[in-house]
């Protein structure tokens, strides 16, 4: 057996535990979602999320250890940022305790790096340099990746993240939280007949802006209450995907990567996946995105990223802290 890494993820509203061998073979992947709990409030409530993580993490670990001998674990990898500080501290405290008790290295993993590494759980042929678009509820980042752990941030959102925009538009349309999957489904029943604006920033670069799009949908809805929700959803989704794809295409032409990757919760969007495949065909660049189960927060991606840090000897001290605003590529130990 190769090196088995225990991954722990508690950065937001998903409590997850996973055991992954050699960064690729998922032996166990357990997850308990808090979506139903936070749906009552239309979004994640940090205090509730932290308390729920405390209730869920130990049963998940017990289940994992019933299926796999803990003495065969080579290291414990845990998300230490970015995310909700209280939620992060739950996973971090448990990971430190396990590292000490099992006498194995502790490895701190950046949550965004975890999303990127979700691709490498399944991609048998990672190629670099690569262009990576990470789209989630809290981030919209376009990244040039020269190799494992070598990142250059090309562009990011200057206001709302793409996933955040989905949820805010969902509230305008009276859709349940999280709105992203609902809008995706509704869009397949509607037509993108309304032309919502796509922000084109004046400065050079690859930054994104979605606040104007969100406002445009709200104003349109107020002025056109009779418009079909399915058509509004399809039109909004088309505009948002267009914004993501246009910047990615611009970077693709200028950076000439060997491969194109998509990551993060919004990577599950069917229209975005379709357009990324079209980009790959147009520019003859291979495209990879995670299977749906690894797009949203999970611990397998944390274990995968942790494995590569383990190979590099990047072990964290037991006084490792949580960093809610941790940047990709930023090292805090």
UniProtKB/Swiss-Prot annotation:
Cofactor(s) essential for the protein: Fe(2+)
The name this protein goes by in its record: tRNA N6-adenosine threonylcarbamoyltransferase
UniProtKB keywords: Acyltransferase, Cytoplasm, Iron, Metal-binding, Transferase, tRNA processing
InterPro entries reported for this sequence: ATPase_NBD (IPR043129), Gcp-like_dom (IPR000905), KAE1/TsaD (IPR017861), Peptidase_M22_CS (IPR017860), TsaD (IPR022450)
A Pfam entry, by short name: TsaD
Catalytic activity: L-threonylcarbamoyladenylate + adenosine(37) in tRNA = N(6)-L-threonylcarbamoyladenosine(37) in tRNA + AMP + H(+)
Subcellular location: Cytoplasm
Binding positions for Fe cation per the UniProt entry: 111, 115, 297
Record keyword Cytoplasm present: yes
Organism of derivation: Carboxydothermus hydrogenoformans (strain ATCC BAA-161 / DSM 6008 / Z-2901)
Co-factor remark: Binds 1 Fe(2+) ion per subunit.
GO cellular component: cytoplasm
Gene Ontology MF, one: N(6)-L-threonylcarbamoyladenine synthase activity
Record's keyword annotation contains ATP-binding: no
Family of this protein: Belongs to the KAE1 / TsaD family.
Function, in words: Required for the formation of a threonylcarbamoyl group on adenosine at position 37 (t(6)A37) in tRNAs that read codons beginning with adenine. Is involved in the transfer of the threonylcarbamoyl moiety of threonylcarbamoyl-AMP (TC-AMP) to the N6 group of A37, together with TsaE and TsaB. TsaD likely plays a direct catalytic role in this reaction.
């Amino acid at each position: 057996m190769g090196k088995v890494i225990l991954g722990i993820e508690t950065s937001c509203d998903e409590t997850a535990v996973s055991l992954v061998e050699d960064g690729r073979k998922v032996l166990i992947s357990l997850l308990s979602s808090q979506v139903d709990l936070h749906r009552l409030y239309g979004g994640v409530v940090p205090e509730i999320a932290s308390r729920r993580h405390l209730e869920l993490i130990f049963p998940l670990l017990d289940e994992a250890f019933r299926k796999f001998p803990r003495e065969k674990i080579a290291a414990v990898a845990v998300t230490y940022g970015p995310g909700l500080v209280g939620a992060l501290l739950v996973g971090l405290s448990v990971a430190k305790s396990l590292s000490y008790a099992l006498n194995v290295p502790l490895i701190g993993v950046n949550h965004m790096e975890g999303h990127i590494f979700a691709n490498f759980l399944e991609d048998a042929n990672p190629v670099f340099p690569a262009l990576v678009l990470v789209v989630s509820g809290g981030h919209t980042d376009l990244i040039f990746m020269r190799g494992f752990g070598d990142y250059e941030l090309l562009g990011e959102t200057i206001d709302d993240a793409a996933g955040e925009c989905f949820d805010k538009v969902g509230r305008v349309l009276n859709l349940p939280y999280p709105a992203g999957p609902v809008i995706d489904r509704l869009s397949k029943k509607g037509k993108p007949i309304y032309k919502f604006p796509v922000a084109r920033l004046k400065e050079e670069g690859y930054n994104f802006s979605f606040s104007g799009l969100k406002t445009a949908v709200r104003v349109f809805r107020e002025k056109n209450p009779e418009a079909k929700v399915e058509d509004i959803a399809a039109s909004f989704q088309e505009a948002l995907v267009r914004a993501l794809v246009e910047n990615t295409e611009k970077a693709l032409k200028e950076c000439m990567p060997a491969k194109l990757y998509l990551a993060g919760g919004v990577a599950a969007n069917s229209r975005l996946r379709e357009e990324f495949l079209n980009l790959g065909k147009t520019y003859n660049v291979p495209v990879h995105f995670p299977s749906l189960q690894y797009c949203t927060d999970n611990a397998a991606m944390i274990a995968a990223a942790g494995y590569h840090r383990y190979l590099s000897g990047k072990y964290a001290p037991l006084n490792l802290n949580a960093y809610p605003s941790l940047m990709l590529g930023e090292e805090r130990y």
